[in-house]
Amino acid sequence: MQSSIPLKQSHYHLFKGLKVLKSSHPEVRKIKRQQSGHSAHGNKVWRSSFVILDYLETHPLQENSCALEIGCGWGLAGLYLRKFQNISVKGIDIDPSVQPYFELQNTINGCEIDFEACSFESLSQQTLSEYQYLIGTDICFWDELTQPLFDLIQKARTAGVKKILIADPGRPPFWALAELCAEKLGSEVITRRIDKPWKSEKYILVIT
């Protein structure tokens, strides 16, 4: 699928082969004007998304597998996996207003990925059993999210999910989650740095 949407170079970052739209793009600005608000901070691309793309380039997932991107926002991680690693992907986000951004970002990059507006707490073990990978970026930003995310991780492991990746700039709720996972599940946290499109250092919780 080829995009017919006009795209000036000043309106996107080119990163790991993806065109990542900036807020200055006319279609992005149009969506923002049409919407009244965002309930869960989904109206921008968070920098942890770029760092997890860098990680996925170095540590590719198994081809022809399935991944679920939780709290997907504009869906960059899933888009990268679909476009470059032949992974079947679905994105979910509690905020339905991110869907136009998600679809625009996919169209610009010539992909189609399913989106569903739902919370990660609503995911059943049966649903999780359809995926080998679970990915999230900047999803642990409130204290009250730590325990539900830990419960989801445990449920996903029971369902047979092979690998879980959660990227974050290092907020206290993320470290609380990482501590829980290290104690109960033997996880690790990786520090990852990128130099472009900005210098940035983030952390990735890896659970296998």
Regions found by a protein language model. Give the residues of each.
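S-adenosylmethionine-dependent methyltransferases
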Residues: M1-T208
